[in-house]
């Protein structure tokens, strides 16, 4: 290991794509993390909101796509795509690209002269000339104020559960109104829980008529990346272009693309199965007799056994406490996101971010698997040019 080594922290789609592109340019690279760990912890019976065409983990030759996997294993296109299918594809991708992944987690990341010092949880240390942080969304669950001081026995985030069997016969409130909230509510019902979903705004079902009924012409409205409403999705598909528009316009587009909304295929699993209370929020939650007493913004109250938060994620650099405080303080930020240049490089030279943490500059595509290509290509070009 030398100062020419690039370290990648995270072995999800973005970390894997970056490592594959660096390998193609013969850049010495170490990647740390458990491959697809976040995805493997999801309930196995889940389906994904992303479409088949937008679930490709990027590689330099575009050879290891979900289509290629499907043809190899005689798997027809799925709508929706099952989580199990995506995980099988990801495993096949790993077998093709042959990355040497160290499944040890990083304990600390600090500056060391012009490079970086990485300490691993097993006590080993590594020197690196460049570091890519590709940690996905798992470190960033959004926890509402009312829930921050409640014990994990009474409140949990949707990402905490690989199944909901423990809630059979329990009264559970799901907070949220997007895909994760509705899918959690559906799985809770199927596990035998009594469920109510409470969302602070209206319930929005994604309207896919233009996508479904225009045949080949759908590509006029939607690129293969398929993030956001018709038309806007073409701008979102090009993160380097997105980066160049004004802050105000970027924020407006981002809100339109990632607003809480539910995929239409989930409708048959949820309608009539549980109570939905839209345009309402929980004002206060207090422990009472092994459960929770809830006060709602509409003046009503509830007594429940547990709350599941389907409230999404809020990426912030400061949440990544393994980054040395002195290093974190040097990273220029905007509302918690690192401010990045065209190479996905932060204000600290040779420190890069991809995935959800890149969304402020490069847009909502960074929150989805389909966005893994742009940072991988840019990082590989920038690093290779500097060696």
Which role does the model predict for each range below?
Residues 2-36, 40, 78-179, 183-387:
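Flavin (primarily FAD) cofactor-binding/catalytic cores of flavoenzymes
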Residues 40-73, 221-243:
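Flavin (FAD/FMN) cofactor-binding and adjacent substrate-gating region
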């Amino acid at each position: 290991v030398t100062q020419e080594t690039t370290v990648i922290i995270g072995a999800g789609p973005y970390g894997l794509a970056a490592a594959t592109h660096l390998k193609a340019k013969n850049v010495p690279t170490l990647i740390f993390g458990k491959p697809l760990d976040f995805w493997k912890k999801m309930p196995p019976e889940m389906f994904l909101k992303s479409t088949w065409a937008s679930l490709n983990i990027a590689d330099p030759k575009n050879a290891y796509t979900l289509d290629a996997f499907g043809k190899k294993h005689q798997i027809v296109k799925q709508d929706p795509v099952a989580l199990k299918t995506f995980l099988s594809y990801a495993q096949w991708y790993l077998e093709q690209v042959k990355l040497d992944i160290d499944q040890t987690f990083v304990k600390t990341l600090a500056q060391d002269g012009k490079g970086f010092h990485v300490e691993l949880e097993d006590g080993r240390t590594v020197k690196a000339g460049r570091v890519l942080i590709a940690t996905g969304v798992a470190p960033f669950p959004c926890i509402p104020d009312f829930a921050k001081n409640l014990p994990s026995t009474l409140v949990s985030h949707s990402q905490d559960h690989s199944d909901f069997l423990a809630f059979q016969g329990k009264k559970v409130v799901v907070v949220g109104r997007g895909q994760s909230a509705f899918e959690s509510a559906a799985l809770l019902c199927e596990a035998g829980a009594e469920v109510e979903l409470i969302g602070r705004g209206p319930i929005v079902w994604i309207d896919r008529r233009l996508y479904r009924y225009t045949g080949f012409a759908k590509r006029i409205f939607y690129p293969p990346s398929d993030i956001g409403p018709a038309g806007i999705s073409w701008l979102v598909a090009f993160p380097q272009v997105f980066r160049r528009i004004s802050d105000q316009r970027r924020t407006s587009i981002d809100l339109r693309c990632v607003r809480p909304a539910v995929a239409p295929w989930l409708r048959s699993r949820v309608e009539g199965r549980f109570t939905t209370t839209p345009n309402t929020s929980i004002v206060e939650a207090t422990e009472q007799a092994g459960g929770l007493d809830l006060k709602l913004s509409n003046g009503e109250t509830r007594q429940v056994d547990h709350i599941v938060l389907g409230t999404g994620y809020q990426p912030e650099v400061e949440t990544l406490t393994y980054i040395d405080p002195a290093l974190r303080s040097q990273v220029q930020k905007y509302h918690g996101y690192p401010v990045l240049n065209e190479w996905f490089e932060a204000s600290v030279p040779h420190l890069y971010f991809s995935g959800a943490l890149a969304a402020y500059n490069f847009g909502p595509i960074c929150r989805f698997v389909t966005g893994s290509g742009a940072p991988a290509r840019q990082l590989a070009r920038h690093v290779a040019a500097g060696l």
